[in-house]
Swiss-Prot record:
GO MF entry, a single one: protein dimerization activity
Keyword Transcription regulation annotated: no
Disulfide topology: none
Record's keyword terms, sorted: DNA-binding, Nucleus, Phosphoprotein, Proto-oncogene
Name of the protein described by the UniProt record: N-myc proto-oncogene protein
Main localization (coarse): nucleus
Length: 441
């Protein structure tokens, strides 16, 4: 299988092309160094389920004392392996699934770190950062804790290489520790430093944190080896934790302003309740003062939520806490005139409202009485008209017309009666004169 790797980086994936062509002739023509397939052809189709893993720091360790170049591979001591990490990736793709990447049974891992069977932990811990998740992180932490408890820690670990502070940059320079390391650092500008991606060291002997190293950006102090391994599963997690710590520090710095703003709001009788939680184990006196201020804010703002009546007494009269100075200034006794004027102003609208309501009520009563009188008058008029006496459903217009006609007829009869009266009176006078003449004769 190692012989199928193409030495030309442009043709490094040509070894995989026969897997996708049905031609058997092309299947065996993989390259000049190609070997015939094994008995089980299907093993060639069993590719790794993950993208190519980043090159480990095992290939970047100190060169041998002889000063020669680093030989990377799984063969014997005299066999030469490609130094380019691109060849490492292609060789990783062509490994059989039963082969161990980071540790082998014969005491040497894939990159010949020479750590023996104790380095099998790395095959569990170091995974690709694209496939990391919370469940995988918990499993890794559990496996790390079990293996750390079962195996004693190594003594006198050398310091690991310094970590590049920015994780967003893809181009990282490999740390150069020897003459053979310069070629690796210059030939692979796009290779990610495993120290940034994996917080777990490839070598167990490099687990401890150096005492004189730089402190992280988040301000955390380095803990023991177990805690450093179980802290996170990728460099992104560490950077996000440091960003969260920076945000928490900014929030802690802004909390004093929040407390002052809440005091101003409480002085203006606004119902505001805040609960600020601070976790700062370094400072001992500052959190205690902060919690006392928060308790005061909660005690002052809680009764304001229950105060619905503006005429009710101030809640500070019943509470044992001393109100702030602004509240004392606001509660200074005012002169009598300003207090009476609002009452008179408030009473005048009330009086005007009451007068308007009484006026409306009286108007409604009078209007109702007028309508009743009008109806009764129409009924009486209808009763006086001889044509409408028995007509209860007569309209008002009909009643008025018939009534006018009846009045005109009555007036004509009156005139006739007056003329008849005058005639009768004149005859009476003639008769009286005749009676007096006969008496005299």
């Amino acid at each position: 299988m190692p012989g199928m790797i193409s030495k030309n980086p442009d043709l490094e994936f040509d070894s995989l092309q026969p897997c996708f062509y049905p031609d058997e002739d092309d299947f065996y023509l993989c390259g000049p160094d190609s070997a015939p397939p094994g008995e089980d052809i299907w093993k060639k189709f069993e590719l790794l389920p993950t993208p190519p893993l980043s090159p480990s720091r095992a290939g970047l360790q100190e060169p041998p004392p002889g000063g020669g170049s680093i030989a990377v591979g799984r063969g014997g001591p005299g066999e030469c392996r490609p130094v380019d990490p691109l060849d490492w990736a292609s060789e990783l793709l062509l490994l059989p699934p039963e082969a161990e990447l980071w540790g082998s049974t014969d005491g040497a891992d894939f990159f010949e770190t020479g750590l023996g069977a104790s380095n099998n932990l790395n095959s569990i811990i170091i995974q690709d950062c694209m496939w990391s998740a919370f469940s995988a992180r918990e499993k890794l932490e559990r496996a790390v804790s079990e293996k750390l408890q079962s195996k004693p820690p190594a003594a006198a670990p050398p310091p690991p290489p310094p970590v590049v502070p920015t994780a967003a940059c893809r181009r990282r320079e490999q740390p150069q520790r020897g003459p053979g390391r310069a070629e690796l650092g210059g030939s692979v500008p796009e290779c990610v430093d495993p120290a940034v991606v994996f917080p777990f060291p490839v070598n167990k002997r490099e687990a401890a944190v150096p005492s004189g190293g730089e402190t992280p950006r988040g301000g955390r102090r380095p803990g023991p080896a177990g805690e450093s391994r179980a802290s996170s599963s990728s460099g992104d997690d560490t950077l996000s934790d440091s960003d969260d710590e920076d945000e928490e520090e900014e929030d802690d710095e802004e909390e004093i302003d929040v407390v002052t703003v809440e005091k101003r709001r409480s002085s203006s009788n606004k119902a505001v309740t805040t609960l600020t939680i601070t976790v700062r184990p370094k400072n001992t006196t500052f959190p205690s003062v902060r919690t006392q201020q928060n308790e005061l804010i909660l005690k002052r703002c809680a009764p304001i939520h229950q105060q619905h009546n503006y005429a009710a007494p101030s809640p500070y009269m019943e509470s044992e806490d001393v109100p702030p100075q602004k509240k004392l200034k606001a509660e200074v006794p005012r002169p009598v005139k300003p207090m009476i004027q609002p009452k008179s102003k408030s009473s005048s609208p009330r009086n005007s409202d009451s007068e308007d309501s009484e006026r409306r009520r009286n108007h409604n009563i009078l209007e109702r009485q007028r309508r009743n009188d009008l109806r009764s008058s129409f009924l009486t008029l209808r009763d006086h008209v001889p044509e409408l006496v028995k007509n209860e459903k007569a309209a008002k217009v009909v009643i008025l017309k018939k009534a006018t006609e009846y009045v005109h007829s009555l007036q004509a009869e009156e005139q006739k009666l007056l003329l008849e009266k005058e005639k009768l009176q004149a005859r009476q006078q003639q008769l009286l004169k005749k009676i007096e003449y006969k008496r005299t004769c």
